[in-house]
């Protein structure tokens, strides 16, 4: 009773602090409020973040507090979104100083991250849909922040249309669930008793609606266009977009994981995500624009996350989306220093290097096979083993095989071993923390898993062949096709920002 009362009090305090940050953002809109108030606003933003950290520390006991659902996943994602939002807003204080939409930016940003945090705390399906819709509206307005620029307005229009389709898909899925189960409470909807009353066609229909609702924000093929167009948004907006919002699909699928049992919807999700991995990787390789490279990377990474969800590895998907969010936010915030020096590496001893390459190939194969044999009947383990072996091989080549002499190879081995150790520690801690909260669903048939494996192997083999035949016609066709996929539509491109003329005339 004491723990329940404590959590209830903390939740009340959290909402008070969240409202205070929202009021602070609205006050900052008034032109008479000095720009220096932004630092006070940043201080107020830290208050709900600190309270969410206290809730996270007390999330050992899960349960419902009114229409809100508190468990380790909800508390973790609330803290994560607010922490990323706080860091990016603090970064933006100087980065966007002088921008005509400076005040509006902080208000919209606070509104968007606040709505996202309340989405993951919602234990009522109606509140979840409402706050997720508010998050998508806030993101659309952030993309359209520079409304005087026709390109930004066009990008917001494209994003808004797709977001509307995604939101209606989620809305109809929740209405269907209520009609079938008679429950609005999330914890009651996903029980075995409630889901047992669903017919096979009803379950499949709801699954397909949820899949459509999550692949659009995740920018999966064929709905990746909005993320490509949104590159015109300010860099801090791109940072929160890629770090804390596009990965929402993994959280939604995790929440409704008991509904999925390896049927046709999971297979469709597997195929679309696998295709997106190949397309996203290709876009990131052919684009020369730094932000477009990151767009391609995000499409591919979200594809991997959804593959994990489709295979029932929801804890791995949550770990993936958190680490990806931290990594991608860092990459966007350091975009200003992305134009570095391109030094040609000199490899003094090619024979020695290729001996190390072969050693890395053998080591990667052994570790990948060993990882797979720990659970040979698990489809996720098979794909993970493939990705693990490939990642280790690439990292070995870059850090060890072509290291600068003995010292360089020792340093590379140290970095590689340290990174692996840190990853496994993080994976173990998150798994121990989340395994009681997250349901592990039935996996798709092994035939579907093998199709995904074949697609990934085909993509890897195609990339290797193309890299060695750059003068072929096929290379030119593939290259131009990937460039076209990664470029915005003509309406969303201007050779010069003509809207600036009105400010100098």
Curated annotation (Swiss-Prot):
Membrane topology, as annotated: Multi-pass membrane protein
Signal peptide (residue range): none
Main location: membrane
One cellular component (GO) term of this entry: plasma membrane
GO biological process terms, semicolon-separated: ATP synthesis coupled electron transport; electron transport coupled proton transport
Family annotation (PANTHER family): INORGANIC CARBON TRANSPORTER SUBUNIT DABB-RELATED, NADH-UBIQUINONE OXIDOREDUCTASE CHAIN 5
Protein name: Probable inorganic carbon transporter subunit DabB
Gene name per UniProt: dabB
């Amino acid at each position: 009773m004491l723990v329940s009362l404590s959590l209830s009090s903390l939740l009340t305090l959290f909402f008070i602090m969240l409202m205070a940050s929202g009021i602070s953002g609205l006050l900052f809109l008034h032109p008479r409020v000095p720009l220096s108030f932004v630092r006070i606003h940043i201080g107020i933003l830290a208050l709900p973040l600190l309270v969410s950290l206290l809730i996270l520390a007390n999330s050992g006991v899960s349960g419902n507090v009114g229409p809100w659902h508190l468990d380790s996943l909800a508390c973790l994602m609330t803290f994560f979104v607010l922490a990323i939002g706080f860091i990016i807003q603090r970064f933006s204080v100087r980065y966007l100083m002088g921008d005509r939409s400076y005040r509006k930016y902080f208000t919209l940003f606070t509104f968007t991250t606040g709505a996202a945090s309340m989405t993951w705390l919602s234990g009522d399906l109606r509140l979840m849909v409402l706050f997720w819709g508010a998050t998508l509206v806030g993101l659309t307005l952030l993309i359209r922040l520079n409304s005087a620029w026709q390109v930004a307005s066009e990008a917001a229009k494209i994003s808004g249309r797709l977001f509307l389709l995604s939101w209606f898909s989620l809305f109809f899925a929740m209405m269907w669930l209520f009609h079938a189960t008679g429950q609005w409470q999330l914890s009651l909807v996903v029980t075995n008793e409630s889901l047992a009353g669903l017919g096979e066609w009803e379950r499949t229909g709801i699954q397909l609606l949820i899949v459509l609702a999550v692949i659009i924000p995740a920018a999966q093929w064929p709905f990746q266009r909005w993320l490509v167009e949104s590159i015109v948004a300010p860099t801090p907006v791109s940072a929160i977009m890629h770090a804390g919002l596009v990965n929402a699909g993994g959280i939604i699928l995790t929440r409704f994981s008991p509904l999925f049992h390896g049927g046709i919807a999971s297979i469709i999700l597997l195929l679309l995500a696998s295709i997106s991995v190949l397309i996203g990787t290709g876009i990131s390789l052919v684009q020369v624009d730094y932000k477009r490279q990151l767009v391609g990377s995000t499409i591919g990474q979200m594809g991997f996350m959804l593959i994990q969800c489709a295979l029932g590895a929801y804890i791995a998907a949550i770990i993936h989306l958190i680490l990806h969010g931290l990594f991608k936010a860092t990459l966007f915030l350091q975009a200003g220093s992305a134009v570095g020096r391109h030094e040609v590496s000199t490899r003094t001893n090619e024979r020695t290097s290729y001996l190390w390459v072969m050693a890395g190939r053998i080591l990667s194969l052994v570790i990948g096979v060993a990882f797979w044999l720990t659970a040979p009947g698990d489809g996720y383990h098979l794909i993970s083993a493939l990705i693990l072996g490939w990642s280790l091989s690439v990292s070995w080549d870059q850090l060890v095989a072509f290291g600068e002499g003995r010292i360089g190879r020792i340093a590379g081995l140290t970095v590689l071993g340290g990174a692996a150790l840190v990853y496994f520690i993080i994976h173990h801690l998150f798994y121990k923390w989340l395994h009681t909260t997250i349901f592990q669903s039935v996996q798709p048939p092994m035939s579907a898993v093998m199709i995904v494996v074949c697609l990934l192997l085909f993509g890897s083999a195609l990339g290797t062949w193309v890299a060695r035949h750059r003068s072929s016609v096929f290379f030119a066709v593939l290259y131009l096709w990937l460039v076209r996929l990664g470029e915005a539509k003509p309406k969303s491109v201007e050779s010069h920002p003509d809207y600036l003329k009105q400010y100098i005339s």
